[in-house]
Amino acid sequence: ERCTSSSRLLVQDTIYEDFTARVAEVAKSIKVGHPLDPETVVGPLIHPEHESKVLSYFAKAREEGATIAAGGEKLGESGCYVAPTLFTDARNDMAIAQEEIFGPVLTAIPFADEAEALAQANDVQYGLAAYLWTRDLDRAMRMTDALEAGMMWVNSENIRHLPSPFGGVKASGIGRDGGDWSFDFYMETVNVSFPRSHHRIPKLGG
């Protein structure tokens, strides 16, 4: 339940099977538990209604043809604990790729080349955060110019410098918060003029 956590993972098709298998193993090893436990990585969801919403996407994923490679279940009898979940064999037009699930889920989608990766990345109504991993600086410059997101991290996880601007594009909002942008976000600029001395107002007409 972190707004800037990416829920879609676009992976080059030539490494898709191996990469997602490794991600599945990592997902299975993540400790879910009480948020005050120092060993906990993922805590509970905030409310039973939201837990029900997140759990409902597991059935949707299967109905649309995706595979649940890890997780896909509620943990324990009490509390709103959901196992970290990886969806594979997914397409970008599936509900698990197009809708905000806001849970411990990741949808892995293959792409063939840079153009397809960009098209899939931008083919959603949201645009808060994006992450790009590449060894090619020219590609990084091209992609960050074209990605439709308010915040981007290149070869980095989400580490935000608080004075930097925060905000999204498209259905993820308008405006920026953070640093000097905070003042603009909460204020309306108004121009008020006062004469500094007496002056004659020009007479118009006869």
Predicted regions, residues:
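ALDH superfamily catalytic-core signature
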Residues: 1-91, 154, 201-204
